[in-house]
């Protein structure tokens, strides 16, 4: 799958792009997607504008509804929030970025976690993809 990266974060993000290339390399998908790296202020603005929630979050996905377009959609990842969560969960920042990207990707495909069954299905798929990329907990 083709992934296009856009860095709107204050630091270099090439190392995360390399990791995500490994994560998504074996996924057979005809459509591309965009991953945009942002900070907490930027994702807070996006969260407020589109979800009416005035606080930062870790990842937000926007599926592309235009069937003529060859893009699944856009995934915004807050590097600031990923750093906090990696410390909280006791794993690497690389693993957290991978998790957030896969989580966002599955949302673009229509997966969700509103019910216990949906959450189990989504999180099982996430772990399978991350384990293949050797980003285990």
Curated annotation (Swiss-Prot):
Residues at which Zn(2+) binds: 103, 107, 113
GO molecular function, one term: metalloendopeptidase activity
Cofactor note: Binds 1 zinc ion.
Domain of life: Bacteria
Matches recorded under InterPro entries: MetalPrtase_cat_dom_sf_prd, YbeY, YbeY_CS
Enzyme class: hydrolase
Cellular component per GO, a single term: cytoplasm
Gene Ontology terms: biological process: rRNA processing
Stored Gene3D superfamilies: Metalloproteases ('zincins'), catalytic domain (3.40.390.30)
Primary localization: cytoplasm
Family that this chain belongs to: Belongs to the endoribonuclease YbeY family.
Function of the protein: Single strand-specific metallo-endoribonuclease involved in late-stage 70S ribosome quality control and in maturation of the 3' terminus of the 16S rRNA.
PANTHER family assigned: ENDORIBONUCLEASE YBEY, CHLOROPLASTIC (PTHR46986:SF1)
Name of the protein this chain belongs to: Endoribonuclease YbeY
Source organism (scientific name): Acholeplasma laidlawii (strain PG-8A)
Gene: ybeY
